[in-house]
């Protein structure tokens, strides 16, 4: 438990009230699409979350399980808050019908989309996501209707060997 003197400059909504972690960055969510896979199947890239609910994308979507992945849980939660429970679950139920595979972690969808195993991945959008566009026939897409996000936290482990150095870093 450590609260940096610099933490005061960070909005309270992006840090733990008890000082266990501080938000280092915001990680937005979106889609990574394999252009070749979608073209081969005559599909256009989705532009919105609601597009993913269209049955034409059946078995083309991979995402991490929100029961396992904190990032995917944050994506689910953010969209539900924006849409409201009733509309949100209606849309996610339809998206679920189109998801072929729920990965164990948030790092799995990107490589599988790049490999052409799936046309669409739902994932955290990092600098690395956009770098994939240079190596693979993929496009990273920020959805037009909303961009859910999660804070990327920084913290010091309780049993860290060099807490003084960690405090300087944090």
Segments from the language model and where they lie:
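Extracytoplasmic ligand-binding site segments that recognize negatively charged/polar headgroups
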Residues: 1-117
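A bilobed periplasmic-binding-protein/Venus flytrap-type ligand-binding module shared by bacterial periplasmic
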Residues: 32-37, 77, 150-162
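Active-site-proximal beta-strand/loop segments in catalytic clefts of secreted hydrolases
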Residues: 35, 64-66, 124-126, 143-144
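Bilobed periplasmic-binding protein/Venus flytrap-like ligand-binding cleft at the lobe interface
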Residues: 47-55, 152-170
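Loop/turn elements at helix/coil->beta-strand transitions in domains of secreted/extracellular proteins
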Residues: 57-61, 116-119, 136-138, 164-167
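Periplasmic-binding protein-like
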Residues: 91-96, 102-103, 134-158
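Short, catalytically relevant binding-site loops at active-site mouths
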Residues: 109-110, 126-130, 145-148
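A ligand-binding cleft/hinge motif common to bilobed small-molecule-binding domains
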Residues: 119-137
């Amino acid at each position: 438990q450590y609260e940096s003197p610099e933490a005061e400059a960070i909005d309270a909504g992006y840090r733990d009230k008890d000082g266990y972690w501080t938000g280092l960055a915001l990680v937005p969510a979106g889609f990574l699409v394999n252009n070749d896979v979608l073209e081969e199947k005559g599909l256009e890239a989705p532009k919105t979350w609601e597009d993913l609910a269209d049955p034409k994308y059946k078995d083309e979507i991979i995402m991490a399980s929100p029961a396992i992945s904190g990032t995917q849980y944050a994506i689910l939660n953010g969209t539900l808050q924006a849409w409201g429970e009733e509309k949100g679950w209606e849309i996610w139920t339809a998206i679920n019908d189109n998801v072929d595979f729920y990965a164990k972690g948030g790092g799995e969808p990107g490589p599988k989309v790049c490999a052409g195993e799936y046309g669409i991945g739902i994932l955290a959008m990092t600098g690395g996501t956009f770098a994939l566009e240079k190596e693979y026939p993929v496009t990273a897409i920020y959805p037009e209707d909303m961009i859910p996000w999660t804070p990327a936290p920084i913290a010091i482990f309780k049993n860290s060997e060099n807490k003084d150095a960690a405090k300087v870093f944090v």
